[in-house]
Amino acid sequence: MSGTSIGQLSHEETTRRGGSTMTETSLYERLGGAFAIAAVVAHFSDAVVQNPIVGQGSENPALHEWHTKNLARLPGLKFMRTLWVCNVAGGPFRYAATKPGSTPVALELAHRELKVSPAQFDKVAAELGRTLDFFKVPDREKDEVLAAFAAHKSEVTEGYLVGASAAAA
């Protein structure tokens, strides 16, 4: 798996070990498939809404507004997040960004107006870690999910960083 990101894993990854070919089960399968992933995403999404730093009590006006005034959109967000996890975990479902961007997942445009700071991103990542622990996801799979999430930190925080750079100029 060296040199391969989570997003590049195929449904079944074939690796060579000791001269023999082994088929490794995809992260998608090890997580339990779409229904298990959807349960984790639903729990995680609800936890983020309740998180005092990044949810309804956030001091970030954009995050506060999203988590109070846009909750009718939460089921759709849970669906999109589920597709995203299934996709990056090597499952059969494909995530398609609702707004085009610099990468196939285009997270920078979806998050730009939220102005998510790096510290706020880390709080969301910690919430994801707690959710994975709640569901007793094994360490290997937990680490892979968190690595896939962390790989998009610069995209998600781009709006904050651009705003901070403009304010400093």
Predicted regions and their residues:
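Core of compact, soluble alpha-helical bundle domains
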Residues: 3-169
